[in-house]
Amino acid sequence: MSLKGNSNEERIWNFLISKGLNPFGVAGLMGNLDRESGLSPINLQNTYEKILGFTDDTYTTSVDNGDYQNFVHDKAGYGIAQWTYWSRKQNLQKYAQEKGASIGDLEMQLEFLIQELSSSYKSVLNVLKTATSVSQASNAVLLNFEKPANQGSSVQKERAECGQKFYDKYASGKGGTSIMGKTITTGWLSAVINGIKINHAFFTSGAFLPFLPLSFF
């Protein structure tokens, strides 16, 4: 699939929604990704730029063309999720090679992210599909997926607040997506049918988006 949107954040939001995460889950995940990498798929952990002598661009290029051979074991966080542990970086690199994509390709990284969540972090993925608040989703990602050294209350608050900004922008109808060259504002409608709460994306024109799934929780 090709990513839809005018910016990395919009492309990431649309992609994750298309994979069945609910708006709270997407926002909570994106808040963490933003604090990790600024949503940049070529982001090299800042503290390692001087240590390794690379910028984001030169590191990515050197890994892609094979000039730099220590990507897996250099302990540097990389990409939108700042993958750091050697086995996860190894799997990321293998996935990129299988796809014939740059290690810094956004779509490839998003697909790999979903693969990780679907296989090794199923409990986190379940929260992202059923969360009832941004903070619930954000903490699930922080504590069980990203697992940074500092997981304290201040970090939890910061990441949840960052995620809330994405929720307010895209899930409340304040955001937009580009379709056939035109920006169309979207939002979410909620209804209770037979005791089941249903969310669905909508156009401001009132037409439903057929390619986005219903979310039940």
Region roles according to the model:
Residues 89-188, 192-193:
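Non-catalytic cell-wall polysaccharide-engagement segments
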